[in-house]
From Swiss-Prot:
Its main location: cytoplasm. It comes from Arabidopsis thaliana. Component of the COP9 signalosome complex (CSN), a complex involved in various cellular and developmental processes such as photomorphogenesis and auxin and jasmonate responses. The CSN complex is an essential regulator of the ubiquitin (Ubl) conjugation pathway by mediating the deneddylation of the cullin subunits of SCF-type E3 ligase complexes, leading to decrease the Ubl ligase activity of SCF. It is involved in repression of photomorphogenesis in darkness by regulating the activity of COP1-containing Ubl ligase complexes. This is COP9 signalosome complex subunit 6a. Although strongly related to metalloprotease proteins, it lacks the JAMM motif that probably constitutes the catalytic center. Its function as protease is therefore unsure.
Length: 317
């Protein structure tokens, strides 16, 4: 197990990076492991058994900004790296870096990413290869294996530290903590991806069940976190655990937000917005009914006028 980092840097990881890595891994795995229907039809069977890899590794760069002691990872892009020869396509990397610089001039290459359960010794080769771009790159590792018992994200961030082992200075990976940072656009995008409909469309009951299951899981996790927090506070009150002023301040800040929802001003604003929404819905229904009524009148006039002309009379409507 890698040791903990002692750099003191604060890392913030945006969900777009996790989505990009997951998408990269899924595409590569699908290409190397085509569906059974494709294999049976003969397409893709010429690649041989060597092409079927259960857990392929993917590689890419992570970009973002560093402000003082805070490193914020915003985005990522793929790399062309050959693990067998340990060669990195420099021209492709420089081209991608130039393109991203035109769109995001403030973003810099902060490190790289890969997939796997743990950092390997061979990962240090690509890590050292990026040190001419960033002297202290970070390594974001995503574990694609599904573990239903794990509650945390399967993402680990490593830093490289110089340690003296057997009298020889060597670079080793040291894992560091991080927090998930999101902006409004990312929250909307991630929520949209999480609620995408299946390819067959699915029934309304299936979509509702999936939505309610997601809400239930979120409430269940919130309840477990609150229970853990309550147990820690009870232990502090009894003296079984030393008081952590930082935790107490965060709990106090959280509790101060709750009475705001019961204030008279909040209720007035809520009722005002609620009535506005009802009024907009009512006006939309009236407009729709008026439009349908006009269409019906036009059709009736057209039909009546046609019948009266056949009889030699003129329509009065």
């Amino acid at each position: 197990m890698a040791p903990s980092s002692s750099s003191g840097l604060t890392f913030k990881l945006h969900p777009l990076v996790i989505v990009n890595i997951s998408d990269h891994y899924t595409r590569v795995k699908t290409q190397l492991n085509p569906p059974a229907s494709i294999c049976a039809s003969g397409h893709g069977s010429n690649n041989g058994e060597a092409m079927f890899q259960q857990n392929p590794r993917v590689y890419g760069c992570v970009i973002g900004v560093q402000r003082g002691r805070t490193v914020e990872i915003f985005n990522s892009f793929e790399l062309l790296y050959d693990p067998s020869t340990q060669t990195l396509d420099r021209s492709f990397l420089e081209k991608k870096q130039e393109l991203y610089k035109k769109v995001f001039p403030d973003f810099y290459i902060l490190g790289w990413y890969s997939t796997g359960s743990d950092a390997e010794e061979s990962d240090m080769h690509i890590h050292k290869a990026l040190m001419d771009i960033n002297e202290s790159p970070v390594y974001v590792l995503l574990n694609p294996a599904i573990n239903h018992t794990q509650k945390d994200l399967p993402v680990t961030i490593y830093e490289s530290e110089l340690h003296v082992i057997d009298g020889i200075p060597q670079l080793i990976f040291a894992h560091t903590s991080y927090t998930i940072e999101t902006v409004e656009a990312e929250r909307i995008s991630v929520d949209h991806v999480a609620h995408l409909k299946p390819s067959d469309g699915g029934s309304a009951a299936t979509q509702l069940a999936a939505h309610l299951t997601g809400i239930h899981s979120a409430i269940k996790m919130l309840n477990s976190r609150i229970r853990v927090l309550y147990q820690n506070l009870a232990a502090m009150q009894k003296g079984d655990k030393s008081c952590d002023n930082s935790v107490l301040r965060q709990v106090s800040s959280l509790l101060r937000r709750l009475p705001a929802m019961e204030s008279e001003r909040f209720q007035d604003n809520f009722l005002m917005e609620y009535n506005d929404k009802l009024l907009i819905t009512y006006l939309a229904m009236i407009t729709n009914c008026s439009s349908n009524m006009n269409e019906m009148v036009d059709k009736f006039n057209t039909a009546y006028d046609r019948n009266t002309r056949r009889g030699g009379r003129t329509a009065f409507m």
